[in-house]
Design a protein with these regions (language model features):
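GHKL-type ATPase core
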Residues: 1-124
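GHKL/Histidine-kinase-like ATPase module
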Residues: 44-47, 80-83, 87-90, 95-187
Length: 187
């Protein structure tokens, strides 16, 4: 998390088994890796059986078994990190459902109406009141949700390929510069 270009590749590299199923045009396809190397080329398959016993009906399912030799004894992924990632991912893809199953078999679903829900929830988290409507823009390349609220400071968050640009970077700079240029004539 947090570094561009490594997400799924790093997970595969650090896994004993890494399997991805996806439903494409009504058919399930699967690709398998073992110890970070291709084990089976993509092939038609049955829907994967999920940890909670249900069969997936559509979408993409990723399952992996970490290579424990790469981790310190007792290393675990914190459930709070998995919850945060699941919630964030649902914000970034409108209508996508992310299901997180914990070690007890309990499943929580995260689904949202996209970036607008992220903005709404962030304003609520800050205990602020929104002033005006949320500006929304969506294209193939870009999604923008922008709102003003009665809160101190700036709370700008940028994401690229599902990963947060923690230090802002050019995405945030370009957004703020464009906003300032467009509002300047009205100040």
């Amino acid at each position: 998390r947090g570094t561009h270009g490594i997400g799924i590749k790093a997970t595969n590299a650090m896994s004993k088994r890494f399997t991805v199923w996806t439903c494409w045009k009504g058919d399930w396809w699967c690709i398998e890796y073992r110890d970070a190397a291709l084990h089976k080329e993509p092939y038609k398959s049955k829907p994967p059986k999920l940890p909670h016993g249900l069969k997936a009906k559509r979408g993409t399912v990723v399952m992996f078994e970490p290579d424990l030799s790469l981790f310190h004894k007792g290393t675990k992924m914190q459930l709070s990190s998995a919850k945060e990632w699941s919630k964030l991912t649902s914000y970034l893809v409108k209508g996508m459902t992310v299901k997180l199953t914990n070690s007890s078999g309990e499943t929580r679903e995260y689904v949202s109406e996209g970036p607008a829900t992220f903005v709404h929830d962030k304003i609520a988290e800050l205990k602020a009141t929104q002033t005006g409507k949320t500006f929304l823009y969506s294209s193939k390349e870009l999604d923008v949700a922008l709102a003003f609220a009665d809160v101190e400071g700036s709370h700008v968050a940028a994401y690229t390929n599902g990963l947060r640009n923690v230090e802002g970077g050019e995405h945030v700079t370009a957004c703020i510069d464009s906003l300032v240029r467009s509002l300047k004539p009205y100040l």
